[in-house]
Amino acid sequence: SDLIRETMDKKFKDITEWLIKGSIDFNFICESLLPSLCEEGSNPLKVGRMEYDAIVVPDCETLRSSTLERLEQFRNQGGKLIFMGNAPVYENAVTSDRGRKLYEKSVCISFDRARLLSALEDNRTVTLRYADGKLTDDFIYQLRKDNDCEWLFISHCCEPYNKDVFRSKNLRIILG
């Protein structure tokens, strides 16, 4: 229905915004392409040229067998597997308890910004904090490797309350 679709769209938008504004590096992994990009689960999970120490499964009702297989292997080898919201109840769109069993062995959090950022705290590459220690929520960054150099670009991502008044903010930038 339209209401279900709207809810799913909102959750997708929310998790994307929480990760970006929470200074967490991430990529979306396409479940249909996963078998061709990741032959088996490992820790870190190797998908194409990328490697992942943490995987977030955001409130999925169904997962493919091939995805569950790789996630189980990743988790069994010590990878950080985080489920947000409810456990998957379907495997290949058929009722199954395989997703629930994996869910129960993993980090389980509610669909909430603070819990997500807290669960991923140890996986940060760059941390942006205000002088008072709070995480920023109005900056984004990009860290690039270019030959033997690394470049860090930080930018505001929100419109200021009043464009005519400049408000400076002291930031603490932590790499690694």
Across the structure, where does each feature detected by a protein language model lie?
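Carbohydrate-binding surfaces of carbohydrate-active enzymes
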Residues: 1-176
